[in-house]
Amino acid sequence: MKQDIHPKYTKVTVTCANCGKDFETRSTRSSIKVDICSNCHPFYTGKQVLVDTAGRVERFKKRFAKATSQSK
């Protein structure tokens, strides 16, 4: 194999945006932030959690309404 062509593979901290839990893994990235981890995921906890997607849906509807009004 050729020398010095592969990216650096180091220890990084993965941080959950939902619960704040941190854990270490190895990656070529400097840090990783995830939306949901196994500590707070509904499958592992047995609790149902509603993820706020209303903002995305409303934004899509607004863009779609604007696009359909312009095409008429």
Swiss-Prot record:
Alphabetical list of PROSITE patterns matching this protein: RIBOSOMAL_L31
GO biological process, one term: translation
Record flagged with keyword Ribonucleoprotein: yes
Family statement drawn from the similarity comment of this UniProt entry: Belongs to the bacterial ribosomal protein bL31 family. Type A subfamily.
Spans through the membrane: none
Keywords of the record: Ribonucleoprotein, Ribosomal protein, RNA-binding, rRNA-binding
Domain of life: Bacteria
Subunit structure: Part of the 50S ribosomal subunit.
Record flagged with keyword rRNA-binding: yes
Name of the protein in question: Large ribosomal subunit protein bL31
A GO term for molecular function: rRNA binding
Coiled-coil segments on the chain, per record: none
Purpose of the protein: Binds the 23S rRNA.
An annotated GO cellular component: ribosome
InterPro entries: Ribosomal_bL28/bL31-like_sf, Ribosomal_bL31, Ribosomal_bL31_A, Ribosomal_bL31_sf
